[in-house]
């Protein structure tokens, strides 16, 4: 069994953040570990408050994991402050893990900022160069590049521009576009397009976390970047198709569809 680490924020409602990451790791037959960088008081409808963990505690959590159970892949999610980013970058540079997948989370599903605006420069300088795969959505890619992204060609141009910042590969997620959901992967050499029909549901809380964690799990399990992204796209699409209509806002995806089917708990 492969060991995976998520470095991200905690979502007490269970739909996103480390909770979504750990569910995704388990669904892919891997052992999940977590380093919490922020505690987020949120639910399906709103973000109430955010409490950031100190950089020193972030580093101690990372030391605790890496000195004992070295991860086969690392997923990085919400990093809200420059100081937190620098702490994570310092330890990743020290331990040099493989298969680092970075989801540059900037906003919650309801639009609440999860990354301080002045932290984007630090993200570009310290975190992006450590990524084997970066997974921004269109608004995040626009913030990183300063571009306006309206077409698939724009997504490709943004992917190239961000890849030049030091990451080895990038998936620009097209879920914010009208029409089918098209994701553009640039692996540093060539482009791949992954397209699925858009599912008409509001219950998409945690989809970005789930997608990036699935990529990390697939890489740890030995798949190529292109196959890892393809399989992650299929996994998250099914999770959205069977999403859970719970809460008063945007409900979460269903991370264990296949497991529930095999157990006879879901038709």
Over which residues does each language-model region extend?
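Conserved phosphate/ATP/ADP-binding segment of small-molecule kinases
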Residues: 117-191
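N-terminal basic/disordered segments at the start of proteins
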Residues: 14-30
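Short, small-residue alpha-helix embedded
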Residues: 19, 142-143, 201-225
């Amino acid at each position: 069994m492969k060991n995976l680490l998520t470095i991200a924020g905690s979502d007490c409602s269970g739909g996103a953040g480390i909770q979504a990451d750990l569910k995704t790791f388990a669904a892919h037959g891997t052992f999940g570990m977590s380093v919490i960088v922020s505690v987020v008081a949120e639910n399906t409808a709103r973000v109430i408050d955010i409490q950031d963990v100190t950089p020193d505690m972030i580093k101690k959590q990372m030391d605790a994991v890496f000195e004992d159970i070295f991860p086969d892949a690392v997923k990085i999610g919400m990093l809200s402050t420059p100081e937190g980013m620098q702490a994570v970058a310092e330890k990743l540079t020290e331990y040099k893990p493989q298969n680092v997948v970075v989801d540059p989370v900037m906003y919650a599903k309801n639009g609440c900022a999860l990354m301080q605006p002045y932290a984007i420069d630090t993200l570009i300088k310290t975190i992006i160069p450590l990524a084997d795969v970066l997974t921004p959505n269109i608004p995040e890619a626009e913030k990183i590049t300063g571009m306006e992204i309206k077409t698939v060609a724009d997504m490709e141009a943004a992917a190239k521009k961000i890849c030049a910042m030091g990451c080895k590969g990038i998936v620009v997620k097209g879920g914010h576009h009208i029409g089918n959901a098209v994701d553009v992967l640039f692996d540093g050499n060539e482009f791949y397009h992954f397209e699925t029909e858009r599912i008409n549901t509001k219950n998409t809380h945690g989809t970005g976390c789930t997608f990036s964690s699935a990529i990390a799990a697939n890489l740890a399990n030995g798949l190529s970047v292109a196959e890892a992204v393809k399989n992650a796209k299929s996994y998250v699409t099914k999770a959205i198709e069977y999403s859970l209509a719970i809460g008063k806002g945007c409900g979460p995806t269903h991370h264990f569809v296949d497991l529930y089917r095999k157990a006879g708990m879901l038709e």
